[in-house]
Swiss-Prot record:
Its main location: cytoplasm. This is Imidazole glycerol phosphate synthase subunit HisH. Heterodimer of HisH and HisF. It is found in: Cytoplasm. Keywords: Amino-acid biosynthesis, Cytoplasm, Glutamine amidotransferase, Histidine biosynthesis, Hydrolase, Lyase. GO terms for biological process: L-histidine biosynthetic process. It holds the Pfam family GATase. Pathway: Amino-acid biosynthesis; L-histidine biosynthesis; L-histidine from 5-phospho-alpha-D-ribose 1-diphosphate: step 5/9. IGPS catalyzes the conversion of PRFAR and glutamine to IGP, AICAR and glutamate. The HisH subunit catalyzes the hydrolysis of glutamine to glutamate and ammonia as part of the synthesis of IGP and AICAR. The resulting ammonia molecule is channeled to the active site of HisF.
Amino acid sequence: MIGVIDYGMGNLYSVSKALERVGVPYFVSEKPEELKEADAFILPGVGSFGDAMDNLGYTKLDQLIHDMVSEGRLLLGICLGMQLLFEESEENGTASGLGLLKGKAVRLKAEDEKGNKLKVPHMGWNRLSFHNESPLLTKTEQGYAYFVHSYYIDGMEENALLASADYGVRVPAVVGKRNVFGAQFHPEKSSTVGMSILTQFTKMAAEQKVKK
């Protein structure tokens, strides 16, 4: 069973519909005591990094996330939810993140190295390039994914980079280390690529449950 974490800033409808399409049992909750029953978790997110962390702290969901990850349960952050997995963000000053992965969310530049203008936010389809192997991407081909974001992760560990996209800079698109994973793009809006990642995540959670 997948627990979708509701902290007031996630695109819950789209994520829920995507999980239904791949036939995955799930529930949505803002209550730590209910979410503790999940086998794995999805942390969606849209909006401001600082506001998101404030909401997670106020609801004590930040502590739940740390506790569940420490127990070895799988976590998948989506869009802003992926950025929250890292140490901090420079959005509206500096805000601390969950610190589960090393790196910082910084603003996308409005031009590439050649001086060509780029629109920020980065919005639309972009091709993925794969880096390190992971069971999360076992069944996923290097296709296109749908992005909507103004910040990207910089300074992350290379061995945690699973896939990237190019938008004037290398944008970490899929990350993963141990039982913590993230997708900067929206899997629920990314057709075959997105559905494959969600399917693999749920398979990994099911396999982990069997091992226990």
